[in-house]
Amino acid sequence: MASDAKFRRVLLKISGEGLMGTREYGLDPETVDRIAREVKSVRDLGVEVCVVIGGGNIFRGVSGASSGMERAAADNMGMLATVINALSVQNALEKVGVETRVQSAIVMPTVCEAFIRRRAIRHLEKGRVVIFAAGTGNPFFTTDTAAALRAVEMGCDALLKATQVDGVYSADPKKVKDAVRYDRLTFNEVLARDLAVMDTSAIALCRENKVPIVVFDLHRPGAFAETVSGRGLFTIIAND
């Protein structure tokens, strides 16, 4: 591994909205291609990278349920949306020469591999990027929880959550001008202050398994590689 990389293996969590760019729905090809280049830059450091992507740019299960749809059915639709996003990012990565595998928690053998932990680890060891799709494969669980679960299963050194801002704030900095930005927090502080980082199930999984969460700005060029190297602006959440 390159000497300036702080982690050996990381999981990158991207929201579905992060793939929209300036659009109001769906995928923005330029944004997807830029994210692929960011992932490649980290892979080129010698870091093993796996990815979980949300589906909110296409369909969000919670929103479907609030409109009267059965929650389990809505969540299944949301999980399928993440497969579309995963295939899009896989295509973008392979265009820049990064060998990539998509593994889905919902089996669809003509589209991608089924999630098999040992196979996923072997892909990472061979230098491939692995994108985990379809969440946990079960309704009522968010893709944040899926990201935490896969990070633990893969033995990742950190879960890197790419967001719209450069870390964790006391309130939404786009709405509250005097929101306080944190450089470092404990898991217990995040839960006690009810900070909007990830859902409580994801936080609990990472806390119990000692996987730090690092929050950084998805939209700043080079931020992923800088964060993996311990530079730039980010918030790290870890045990005491």
UniProtKB/Swiss-Prot annotation:
One of its GO terms (molecular function) is ATP binding. It comes from the Bacteria. UMP binds at G55, D75, T136, G137, N138, P139, F140, F141, T142, T143. Its EC number is 2.7.4.22. Keywords: ATP-binding, Cytoplasm, Kinase, Nucleotide-binding, Pyrimidine biosynthesis, Transferase. The keyword ATP-binding applies. It is found in: Cytoplasm. InterPro entries: AceGlu_kinase-like_sf, Asp/Glu/Uridylate_kinase, Uridylate_kinase, Uridylate_kinase_bac. It catalyses: UMP + ATP = UDP + ADP. The keyword Mitochondrion does not apply. Its main location: cytoplasm. Inhibited by UTP. One of its GO terms (biological process) is 'de novo' CTP biosynthetic process. Pathway: Pyrimidine metabolism; CTP biosynthesis via de novo pathway; UDP from UMP (UMPK route): step 1/1. One of its GO terms (cellular component) is cytosol. Catalyzes the reversible phosphorylation of UMP to UDP. Homohexamer. This is Uridylate kinase. It comes from Paramagnetospirillum magneticum (strain ATCC 700264 / AMB-1) (Magnetospirillum magneticum).
